[in-house]
């Protein structure tokens, strides 16, 4: 590869683009104009349209010199991968990044299992309106930057009346880079915005599900309370029946007690009457008893009245016999 082409590859690095503070809002893109002047441009060829997709074999030809024979050979035989020595910007660090082993690649499954969102409230899981608005604003800013500033400037530089094909190729490369970066950045920001919006929608649905769960729990608690009330109502009804039976028994017992007291009152009254009658009867009984005892004494065959009468009769008989 010739020196000029290698220098062009170097200029694609970070030092080829910088902002000059000429105006506050005007972004100036440094092109190879500062390096290549028209009087010493190494390549001259007709102007090529911007919208075409030229191949390396048809875009321009390298002048065959002793310094660029290797580049012309690659150009004639089509595209071939260049050697590492043709890319001075690739160092050992970049090689290590390119040849990174698959074991160092981030594993999404390990990354997802590393986080636990169980203890995080929903309000922290949802994206704030500030974040969503910031993503939208950044997307608008980048679109405005590329679509209204960088891409039109690159197109304007490409369409200049200039016969330097190498410089036009750099302008075209800039234009393609700006378009690619703009499209990819727009898609990425749109994906990020969609992810945040979807996250908020899922958080809202999760809130609705949790609210519905809470309502169902309250309904379950209400149903359980009603069931307990029904069970308690049945028990209360049974208790009321038992209480009614007990009250009936108490009333019956009271009536029995009243009847018993009434009967006992009559018995006491009768007993008093009978006690008075028994006293009179006792007097009569005593007299009767005395009469019987007197009768028994009188009828005693040894000491009774008859024995006395007989004894008197015998004494009288004995007294009368001497007189006769």
Swiss-Prot record:
Note: Present with 1630 molecules/cell in log phase SD medium.
Keyword entries, A-Z: Cell cycle, Cell division, Centromere, Chromosome, Coiled coil, Kinetochore, Meiosis, Mitosis, Nucleus, Phosphoprotein
Subunit details: Component of the heterotetrameric kinetochore subcomplex COMA, which consists of AME1, CTF19, MCM21 and OKP1. The COMA subcomplex is part of a larger constitutive centromere-associated network (CCAN) (also known as central kinetochore CTF19 complex in yeast), which is composed of at least AME1, CHL4, CNN1, CTF3, CTF19, IML3, MCM16, MCM21, MCM22, MHF1, MHF2, MIF2, NKP1, NKP2, OKP1 and WIP1. COMA binds the centromeric nucleosome-binding protein MIF2, and to the outer kinetochore MIND subcomplex, probably via AME1. AME1 interacts directly with OKP1 and an NKP1-NKP2 dimer.
Protein name: Inner kinetochore subunit AME1
Record-linked InterPro entries: AME1 (IPR048743)
Organism: Saccharomyces cerevisiae (strain ATCC 204508 / S288c) (Baker's yeast)
Main location: nucleus
Residues bearing PTM Phosphoserine: 41, 45, 53, 59, 101
GO cellular component, one term: COMA complex
Record function comment: Component of the kinetochore, a multiprotein complex that assembles on centromeric DNA and attaches chromosomes to spindle microtubules, mediating chromosome segregation and sister chromatid segregation during meiosis and mitosis. Component of the inner kinetochore COMA complex, which connects centromere-associated proteins and the outer kinetochore. COMA interacts with other inner kinetochore proteins to form the inner kinetochore constitutive centromere-associated network (CCAN), which serves as a structural platform for outer kinetochore assembly.
Family: Belongs to the CENP-U/AME1 family.
Cellular location(s): Nucleus; Chromosome, Centromere, Kinetochore
Name of the gene this protein is made from: AME1
GO biological process, one term: protein localization to kinetochore
Stretches of the chain forming a coiled coil according to its record: 199-263
